[in-house]
Structure formats: C-alpha cells, structure tokens
C-alpha cells in the first residue's frame, strides 16, 4: 500500500525532485485559502492526511498508524537524521487564512502514541526551536534546516507569524518575498523557466493582506528589486540560510507555544499593598512584554476567554469562575533565555504580563493525569505539586506532549513524563535494553563508567540512518597484568528487519532473533556478557538538542543590596549548583588548616551573582572544630563583621563568606601609604563598633589585628574606608609572633590569654597602632624581649607615633588598651567622643589613591602548585572559574573531563564575556598536571598563537598562573575514538578525505619549519560541520621548530610513543619533518584499520625489540580493505632513509591526484553545507 509514502498522485518535478515553488505557491495561496486542494482535502477517503511543506501536498497514511509512526515515516522520506526526529510533530492543520480576532484558534498537537482522526487534516511541522536556530540547526542536521525554510515560507505566506504581519512589517515581508522569488528562480529547470517567469508570479509570494492593500504600488517595486538582485545573487543554499536567519531574528518567539489553563494559586506572586507574597520568595518574579499571539500559539485567548474552539473535537471542561481558580497563560521559557523554566501569567488584556516562575524544567519529574482535562505537575520545591485544568482534552494532551518532549530534549531523553500517555518507541527501547542514537563517544564513556569489563556491551541506534544499530563491545584484554591493562572495544553494524537482527561480523552476515544472541556470537576473551542498559539520567550531547551550545550571560545591572545580604540567615550551599570557584586565587590561611579561595554565589533570579570568599577545611582538619567555628560565626549579626552567607556540608567543607574587594587591611595600608587621616578615623569608627558588639555579646575573638580585617569599601571622594572583622579561623595555638596582640602578663603562658575576654581589648589597641602607623612595620616579627624592653622604657610595648600621623587622643586610646588595669582598656563612649572631636578639628584632606590591585581573598602567600594538589580536595564536579583577560573568563566543571595525556588533562568549558551581549562560547581547556613541564607549556602557547589553518585546532586564550590553554571545542572528540566507534559507517572515500585533511595541516606546519613530534590519531580531533566531518591536528606539547638544517635534537628521553616514532627518532632523538611523515604513515594505518593499535606481527616484546625489527625492515601489516595506493603511501612514509620519504606537499599531491581532485566527504544520505562565497555578506 502506497499510503505511507504519500500515494502515487504526487506531482514530481523530474529535475529538482519536488513540486516547484511556484506550483506550491499556487496551491497554498488559492486552494488552501478556500478550504480545498487539488487532492480534495475535505473529502474523507478513510486515510490520514498530513500536509508536507516541502512538496506542498498532503501525504496519505493508513488510519491504524500511530502519530509517532507517521512522524518517523515523514522523517525518513525527507532525509531528516534520527537525532533530530523529536524536533518534529503532527498538528492539526489550519486551512483558513486568518481567524477572526474574536474566535479562539485551537490547533492542537497529537501525542506520539495517539491515532489520528480521518475526519481532520494535519500537518507535519518542526515544533521545537533549537537554541541559536539559524546557526546550530544546520550543524545538527542540514536537512532539518532546509525543511525549516519550507515551513517558514508557508507560515509567512499564510500570515501565521504574528511578529512579521502586515502592516507593522510591510518592508520586511516584502524583502522576504523577494528572497523567496530568488530561491524559486534558481531552483527552476530551464524548461520551467521557459514556460513561466517567476517575476510575473510575484503576487503568489506576498501575504494576501499586503497585496490587497498595496497592489498598485508594490508590484513594480518588487519586480525592480528582484531584477537587481537576480543579476548578482547568492547561491540557493546561502539564500535559504539568510531567509531562516531573518525570520528567526524578526520572530524570536517563533515555535514558542503558549497554553491557557486554570490554576488554584500563583507561586511566588507579589501581592499588591503589602499583603505579602504567595509562596516563598519574590526572587523568581519578572516582567516581560508578552506577544499576545506567539507563533503556533496553542489555546491562546485573544479577547474572549470563553469563546468556543474551532474544530472543537475533544472533551471540554467548564471554565471555573474567578473565585474557583485563576486563568493563566502557561509558557516554557527555554534554556537559552535569561530566566529559563515553566512560567505562568494571569490572563489579562494589558500589554504587559507578569511572568512568574513555577519551577525549573529539569525539576519537573512527573505529570499525573487527574481527569480528561486536568493534570498535576510534580515539581521539586512544590510539595503538593501544581494542578492545571485545561478547557479541552486536546489542549491538555498538547501540553503534555510539549512539556514531555521538551524535557526529553533537554535533560532526560529516556524518560516519559506522563505514564498515562506512553511513547511507543521509548517502551520498545526499554524492552530491548537498547540506547537511542547516543553516538560512539558517549557509548565509550558509558562502558568506562561501568567498569570497562571484558564482555560488557552497549547496543545503540545509529544517529545517521534508520533501522541501523551498533553494538559496542569489549572483546579483548590488552596489556594483561600490567598497569596499562585495558579492554579493546569493537563496534559492529546491525540491520534490523522486522523482528530479526542481521549482524555484519567476520566478513559475513548472521541473522539472529535477539540482541542477546548478537552479543554472544561475537567472540571475546571472556565468556560472560554484561549488558549496559540506558538510564533516564544519561545525558548524551547528541540528543539534548534544546540545551544551548553557547549560553547567554546573565544580562542585568540589578544586584542584591548589602542590607538584603546582611538580613539573610546563613544557608546550606550545594557546591555543585550554587557556587563557582576561582582555583587561581587559592591560598593557605594563617591557621594552616584552611584554604581560601575567591568564588561566586550563583543567583537563580535575574540579579548579578554575588562575589564571595570561600574558606575550605583541609582534608586532615577536624570537622567538629570547623563546625563550631561556623556555628559561632553564623550567630553574628553585625555589619562590622564579614557576613557568613552559609556553608557546604560536603567535601570540601566550606564557609561561604562576604567578599573583600581590596583584601586584608595590613596589605592595603602598606600599599597605600597616603590614605588620609579622615579615612583612618572612619575605619577606626567601624572597628570600635565591632569591638562593642563583641563585648556586648560576650564573644572572645582571639585574632583582632589588621591582617584579619578586610577592606570592603574605599572611596576617597566620599571619605569612606570600611574594613570588616573576619572570623578567627581554625583553632590553633598562639605563637611568639602573636605577642604584640597579647597582654604581657601572658607571655610565659600565651594560651591562657585565649579565655580572657579583656585580652582582645589589648589586641584592639595594637590594631589601632597598626592602622595609624600605616602598617609600615610587620609587628609579627618582633620578639617578646623587644616588646618588654620598650615597655620598661616608656610603659608602652611599642614606640610612640608621630602626632602628624596619629593624633594624641588616638594614641591615648592605644595606651588605654595597653594598660595593666583591665577596666581602662576600652570605653566606646570615650573613644567615640575623641573621634568626633578630632573630626571637628581637622579639615578633610584627601589625596587621590594610586591604582591598586584587587584580590578577593587578600594577598596571603599563594602556594606553589607543586607543593599541594591542584585543588585541596579530591576531583569533584564544582564550577571552576579562571580569569583570562579584562574582557572574559573561562568556566568549567571538573566532571567534564574530555581527555587526558601524559602532561595534561582537557576539560570542556565555556568562555563568559564581560560584554553581556556576547554569548558564551564552548571551549576546551587543556590544563597541565604538573608545573615541572612549564617550559613545554610556554613553548606550546608560543607555537599555537602563530597557527591559523582550517585543519589545525584554533588557539583562543591562555592563563599562565593556571598553566592552561583555551582552544576551540570540537564536539565529535578524539579521532582514535571516532575511528573505532564509527568504523561500520566509515567507507574508504571518507577516510581518504580525512587523510588529505591531515596532510594539508601537516604541510602547513612543515612549511613553517615546525616539527609536531606527536602526530597520531589520539592527537587529532574531529569537527562536525553540518552533515560532513573534517579533522584538525591538536596537541603541540612536544612540537619544536627545526634548526637551519631541518632537525631538532631532543635533550632528554621521556615517555615517548615509540610505535609512532621513526627509527632515527627512537635511536638518536633526532626529529625532522621526515620523522613526522613516518608518524603520518602510522596514523594512516590507524585510520584504515579503523582504530587498531599499530603493533608489529607478532607483537613486539620491548622497545629494543621494536626498534631492531624496524631497522631490519619489518613494517606494519596492510589493514583489511585498505586501498592499494594508501598502503603504497604508507610504505613510502616508512622508508628507512628519512630524505627518501615524501614531503607533506608531495603527499597532498599524491592523494589529490589519485582521486582526481574530487575528494569529498561522503554524504550518507545527507548533503554537505554550502560553501559561503567571499562576497556573501
């Protein structure tokens, strides 16, 4: 039966393989406008009719087919990749031009497991908008980008995009129509061009309302512009790209769905006139302009919320009265918006809606069906869930399908959100214990995470073809009984036909009845098989299409006030989601048991993140002592002390403190000797208030001194200098260096001073002395003998200060603090009186401060990275921040490690720019494991900064303090993994094109006089570009520039990859471009063996054995299915005499000549993206 393929009445254009655009225009603008078509769409012939935007016709399907089956068939027919299938859906089709503004438009979507109604007509549409639509969609799936153009064109002509409607956007609509005409003109065959002129059919490309209003004027203008652009037009592919680009930017809510329902309450709603908020916080409430009719809006009320729906099949619920509920709009704000999540807004006729966050999308873990029109959402943070009542059953189903698929495409691809409406394909994958199209690299990671046992396997769907599966199975144990022992993973192709599985294995095909049989027929070193099933917690990057590749930075000038931060009670932080860490700022505190680091407290609401200082307990510290410190500090409620915002209760145990922009006071004053007297008096005023707070609350601090006061504000123009008292730190004994801050009577028993509440008044006096002496002298270097000698001279432990820098009343206060009579040491009344007297007597005399460096954690000695681990806690999954320049910083998660080598580890992260209009950019961060190879690090930076070639990985930034290099991120990952896991789908033409990529990149390096010294598949990355792939050379850690003779002589023998090295490089450490050519030959072996290890046969027993056999003439065997000319090229690369090997320029010529200059990437059913001409913009 031909129903599933659209029947045999399709109009096929022999030259283009589709109905011509002009014919489609005629169909959509005349037949559909009147509610009919050439196929009599309202005639019920017992089939399901689905409109196809690509052909402009209705496809017919058997009525027993489920919605998901029809979607699958349409995707196959249109060449849409399996990974993109969930972006599409089936919706009821509008055959009217434009509904009356008083009529409720009800175009609902079908659930995947639902059967469609023969009485209705439907359309196949892209439903979900991927982030950065105009650029990312083409990279995900080129065919989807082409389909979107057809869909947008149809929606423009039928005026279904509210944001680009006449009359507001007359010029934009006209411009898009001209672009449409240019595309259609280029896609016509010569015969079609002879039969009709696109220029004369211009009215078919215009929205009808525009044509009716301006038919007299617009015709001549469009024809004139069309003729002008046609003479120098871009290619069809670039025109389509610009069309999609224009529409996506003019209509930012295109493919955004908005629902209407009734709820019982609005969480976090701000109630007017001081009646308080409903819910817990106002932080999630935000205002935004509502587009009253967003594209493809579902169940959106325009003016009358009780209007009757068109095509109103489906059960209806009586709309509750206002007293029984609240009518709201519901919308999912996507992950690339500033405040993503599920939001609601009261239905109102006002132009501005108040959108209120119900919950993060990833926090919605279930939808329960209450009845035919009502659901309850189970959401993290809402203990009793959140009920929604829709007007019809169809609306409810549309909402369930939208939210369920959105969550699959953003967080949990293997999960059905509503168990009342199951997805058939998910149930089948679950019953087969099979993964979706997760890709080979993610499969390898899963095998590693699950122990990497021999016999472990994963079965996954192919991400390029339908009905094709792969099995990734660990078959061999390599390097047994050594510290390098690991499993070899092999990948085999499986074709599914009905209920049977056809396995390609050992040069034959085996037809089997189950995947269990498939796993057991493949030979492995272990008889056992361990199947690794899919999990709802899997996060394969290939499938999470709605997660933005480049997140937008939080664009806001709003920030929490100091008063608001002071009011908040300390909280428990999740170190993974609430905090960002700056590992470059790490330092060891004076107590020796805690590390200090700068950080950011991430704010979920639309305000700036809060800068914080984090104090982390060392792994050998006592948690109870840490907890007692945090408990004491959490009770302090005074602005004179650094605020404790909260703490983490997971390793590393951390106190999250108020941030000090200028660091400790002693360092600040030492670097700012000209701080004026007024500023110092202002500073002292705050310190006196802090001491009074300690006295009133009977708190013994024990560490009052300038090094423990942190400067938070300095504004000489306003005469402000604020410093706050920090916590005393981890308990530790007093040392002799603490003597200036301890009463002399305790010099023989320093520890006894810790229980004396008057002892900190002595410390207060010494601290005032430090302040007014501008910390010129480090008092901690003074010995007790010196202090006692000075006290015997004039009664004070330190010399008197000159009255020019310290007024007499201030030094009188200092002497009171050093008095042996404890009752005279501190009187805040007397001190405030003295301060006021001094301020009244002197005039403000401020000098402009010199520029100073800011350091959030102070200037404590930064520890050499070789003395401690990279971080003072085990590998974790916290967000790390490294400042790069004044313009940007890099943020990464240690959990996102994507590679590890001898000298470094590579993480995935993103660049965040200070310019909030510039989106975040995904990058790879290569971080050295040890500082002992810092010379290599600087050399690698110096080399990478000079390189610019399409087959060389792009260098972006570097951070010397962190010893890390920031490079472009290539999602397809390492070439050696790609070879193994894409092996069944890798044909020789594709491999030859990769060989040419590498040769071109190496020719560029060779021309620059650069020797790579580590060329291998593991150091090559794969770049997925649209529907094609190319490769780029990376890892220049061993690279060197050659001398005038073309050689580089290594000075030391370190761990070297001998199986890729030429004999002269192994034996004499002499490297040249010719030794790179040898490595290129070995890399060719890796490629055409589909990822095999380059071992001699029989395998070498040692490095010496390997070298001896190479020198005796042995070479790697020819890989199976390797073309003759490629193995001949390998043999040339492995010539014993270096200068007899071909140069890379010669290699490029050999490959190009062999394939007659027509080496292209195979399409596997997909077309490569177009090349943009230089004059395209």
Swiss-Prot record:
Quote the record's binding site residues for ATP.
Answer: 898-906, 926
What positions constitute the catalytic site? Answer: 1014 (proton acceptor)
SMART domains registered for this protein in UniProt = B41, TyrKc
Q: Which GO terms describe its biological process?
A: blastoderm segmentation; border follicle cell migration; cell differentiation; cell surface receptor signaling pathway via JAK-STAT; compound eye development; compound eye morphogenesis; compound eye photoreceptor cell differentiation; cytokine-mediated signaling pathway
Q: Where in the cell is it found?
A: Endomembrane system
Q: Which PROSITE patterns match?
A: FERM_3 (PS50057), PROTEIN_KINASE_ATP (PS00107), PROTEIN_KINASE_DOM (PS50011), PROTEIN_KINASE_TYR (PS00109)
Q: Which UniProt keywords apply?
A: ATP-binding, Developmental protein, Kinase, Membrane, Nucleotide-binding, Phosphoprotein, Repeat, SH2 domain, Transcription, Transcription regulation, Transferase, Tyrosine-protein kinase
Q: What Gene Ontology terms describe where this protein resides (cellular component)?
A: cytoplasmic side of plasma membrane; cytoskeleton; cytosol; endomembrane system
Positions where Phosphotyrosine occurs in the chain:
1047-1048
Specify residue ranges for compositional bias: Polar residues.
16-41
Q: Which reaction does it catalyse?
A: L-tyrosyl-[protein] + ATP = O-phospho-L-tyrosyl-[protein] + ADP + H(+)
Q: Which residues form the SH2 domain?
A: 433-539
Q: Which InterPro entries match?
A: Band_41_domain (IPR019749), FERM_domain (IPR000299), JAK (IPR051286), Kinase-like_dom_sf (IPR011009), Prot_kinase_dom (IPR000719), Protein_kinase_ATP_BS (IPR017441), Ser-Thr/Tyr_kinase_cat_dom (IPR001245), SH2 (IPR000980)
- MF terms in GO: ATP binding; cytokine receptor binding; non-membrane spanning protein tyrosine kinase activity; protein tyrosine kinase activity
Give all Phosphoserine modified positions.
40, 321
Q: How does it assemble?
A: Forms a complex with Hsp83 and piwi; probably Hop mediates the interaction between piwi and Hsp83.
The family line of this record is: Belongs to the protein kinase superfamily. Tyr protein kinase family. JAK subfamily.
Q: What is known of its domains?
A: Possesses two phosphotransferase domains. The second one probably contains the catalytic domain, while the presence of slight differences suggest a different role for domain 1.
Annotated protein name in UniProt: Tyrosine-protein kinase hopscotch
Source species? Drosophila melanogaster
Higher taxonomy: Eukaryota, Metazoa, Ecdysozoa, Arthropoda, Hexapoda
């Amino acid at each position: 039966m031909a129903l599933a393929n659209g029947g045999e009445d399709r109009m096929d254009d022999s030259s283009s393989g589709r109905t011509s655009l002009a014919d489609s225009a005629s169909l959509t603008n005349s037949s559909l406008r009147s509610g009919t078509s050439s196929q009599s769409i309202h005639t019920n012939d017992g089939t399901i009719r689905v409109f196809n935007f690509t052909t402009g016709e209705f496809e017919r399907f058997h009525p027993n087919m489920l919605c998901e089956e029809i979607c699958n068939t349409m995707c196959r027919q249109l060449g849409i990749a399996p990974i993109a299938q969930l972006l599409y859906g089936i919706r009821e089709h509008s055959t009217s031009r434009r509904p009356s503004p008083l009529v409720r438009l009800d175009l609902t979507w079908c659930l995947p497991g639902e059967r469609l109604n023969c009485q209705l007509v439907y359309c196949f549409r892209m439903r979900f908008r991927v982030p950065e639509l105009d650029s990312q969609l083409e990279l995900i799936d080129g065919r989807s980008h082409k389909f979107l153009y057809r869909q947008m064109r149809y929606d423009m002509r039928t005026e279904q995009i509210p944001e680009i409607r006449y009359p507001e956007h007359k010029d934009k609509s006209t411009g898009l129509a001209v672009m449409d005409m240019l595309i259609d003109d280029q896609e016509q065959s010569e015969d079609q061009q002879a039969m009709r002129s696109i220029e004369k059919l211009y009215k078919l490309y215009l929205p009808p309302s525009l044509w009716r209003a301006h038919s007299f004027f617009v015709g001549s203008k469009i024809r004139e512009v069309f003729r002008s652009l046609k003479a120098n037009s871009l290619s069809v592919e670039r025109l389509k790209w610009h069309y999609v680009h224009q529409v996506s930017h003019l209509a930012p809510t295109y493919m955004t769905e908005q629902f209407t329902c009734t709820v019982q309450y609005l969480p976090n709603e701000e109630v007017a006139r001081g009646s308080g908020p409903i819910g817990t916080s106002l932080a999630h409430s935000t205002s935004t302009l509502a587009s009253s009719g967003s594209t493809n809006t579902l169940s959106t009320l325009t003016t009358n919320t009780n209007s009757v729906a068109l095509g109103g099949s489906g059960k209806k619920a009586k709309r509750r009265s206002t007293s029984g509920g609240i009518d709201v709009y519901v919308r999912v704000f996507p992950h690339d918006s500033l405040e993503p999540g599920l939001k609601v807004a009261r239905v109102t006729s006002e132009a501005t809606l108040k959108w209120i966050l119900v919950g993060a999308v990833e926090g919605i873990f279930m939808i329960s069906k209450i009845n035919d029109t009502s659901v309850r959402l189970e959401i993290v943070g809402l203990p009793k869930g959140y009920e929604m009542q829709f007007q019809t059953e169809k609306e409810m189903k549309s909402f369930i399908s939208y939210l369920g698929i959105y969550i699959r495409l953003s967080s949990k691809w293997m999960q059905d959100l509503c168990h009342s409406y199951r997805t058939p394909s998910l149930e089948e994958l679950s019953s087969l214990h099979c993964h979706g199209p997760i890709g080979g690299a993610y499969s390898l990671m899963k095998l590693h995470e699950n122990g990497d046992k021999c016999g472990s396997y994963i079965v996954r769907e192919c991400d390029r073809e339908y009905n094709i599966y792969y099995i990734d199975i660990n078959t061999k144990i390599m390097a047994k009984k050594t510290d390098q022992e690991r499993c070899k993973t092999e990948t085999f192709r499986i074709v599914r036909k009905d209920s049977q599985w056809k396995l390609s294995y050992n040069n034959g095909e085996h037809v089997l009845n189950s995947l269990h049989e498939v796993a057991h027929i493949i030979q492995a070193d272990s008889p056992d098989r361990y199947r690794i099933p899919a999990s709802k917690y899997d996060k394969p990057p290939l499938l999470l299409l709605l997660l933005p590749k480049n997140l937008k930075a939080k664009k806001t000038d709003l920030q929490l006030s100091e008063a608001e931060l002071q009011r908040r009670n300390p909280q428990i932080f999740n170190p993974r989601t609430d905090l960002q860490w700056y590992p470059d700022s790490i330092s060891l505190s004076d107590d020796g048991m805690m590390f200090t680091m700068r950080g950011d407290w991430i704010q979920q609401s639309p305000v700036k993140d809060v800068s914080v200082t984090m104090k982390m307990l060392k792994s050998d510290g006592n948690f109870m002592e840490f907890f007692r410190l945090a408990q004491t500090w959490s009770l302090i409620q005074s602005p004179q002390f650094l605020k404790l915002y909260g703490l983490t209760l997971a390793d590393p145990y951390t106190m999250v403190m108020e941030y000090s922009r200028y660091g400790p006071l002693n360092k600040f004053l030492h670097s700012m000797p000209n701080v004026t007297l007024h500023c110092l008096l202002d500073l002292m005023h705050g310190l006196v208030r802090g001491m009074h707070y300690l006295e009133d609350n009977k708190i013994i601090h024990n560490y009052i001194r300038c090094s423990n006061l942190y400067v938070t504000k300095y504004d000489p123009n306003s005469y402000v200098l604020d410093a706050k008292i920090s916590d005393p730190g981890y308990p530790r004994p007093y040392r002799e260096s603490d003597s200036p801050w301890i009463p002399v009577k305790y010099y023989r028993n320093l520890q006894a001073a810790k229980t004396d509440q008057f002892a900190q008044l002595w410390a207060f006096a010494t601290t005032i002395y430090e302040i007014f002496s501008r910390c010129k002298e480090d008092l901690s270097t003074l010995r007790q003998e010196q202090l006692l000698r000075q006290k015997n001279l004039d009664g004070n432990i330190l010399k008197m200060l000159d009255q020019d820098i310290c007024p007499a009343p201030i030094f009188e206060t200092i002497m009171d603090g050093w008095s042996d009579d404890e009752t005279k040491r501190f009187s805040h009344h007397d001190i405030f009186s003295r301060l006021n007297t001094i301020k009244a007597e002197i005039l403000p005399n401020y000098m402009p401060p010199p520029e100073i460096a800011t350091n959030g954690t102070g200037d404590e000695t930064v520890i050499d990275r070789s003395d401690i681990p990279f971080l003072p806690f085990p590998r974790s999954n916290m967000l790390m921040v490294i400042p790069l320049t004044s313009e940007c910083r890099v943020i990464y998660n240690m959990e996102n490690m994507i590679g590890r080598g001898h000298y470094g580890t590579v993480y995935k992260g993103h660049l965040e720019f200070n310019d909030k209009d510039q989106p975040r950019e995904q990058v790879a961060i290569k971080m050295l494991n040890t500082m002992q190879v810092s010379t290599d690090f600087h050399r690698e930076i110096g080399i990478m900064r000079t390189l610019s070639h399409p087959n060389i990985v792009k260098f972006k930034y570097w951070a010397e303090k962190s010893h890390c290099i920031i490079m472009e991120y290539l999602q397809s990952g390492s070439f050696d993994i790609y070879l193994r896991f894409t092996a069944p789908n890798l044909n020789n033409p594709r491999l030859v094109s990769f060989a040419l990529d590498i040769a071109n990149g190496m020719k560029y390096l060779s021309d620059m006089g650069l020797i790579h010294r580590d060329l291998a598949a593991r150091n090559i990355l794969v770049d997925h570009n649209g529907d094609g792939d190319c490769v780029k050379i990376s890892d220049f850690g061993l690279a060197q520039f050659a001398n005038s003779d073309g050689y580089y002589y290594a000075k030391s023998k370190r761990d070297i990859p001998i199986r890729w090295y030429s004999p002269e490089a192994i034996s004499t450490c002499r490297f040249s471009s010719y030794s790179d050519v040898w490595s290129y030959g070995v890399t060719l072996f890796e490629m055409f063996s589909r990822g095999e290890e380059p071992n001699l046969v029989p395998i070498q027993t040692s490095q010496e054995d390997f070298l001896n056999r190479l020198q005796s003439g042995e070479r790697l065997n020819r890989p199976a299915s390797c073309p003759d000319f490629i193995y001949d090229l390998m043999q040339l690369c492995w010539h014993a005499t270096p200068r007899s090997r071909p140069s890379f320029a010669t290699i490029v010529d050999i490959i190009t000549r062999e394939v007659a200059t027509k080496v292209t990437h195979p399409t596997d059913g997909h077309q490569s993206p177009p090349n943009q001409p230089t004059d395209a913009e």
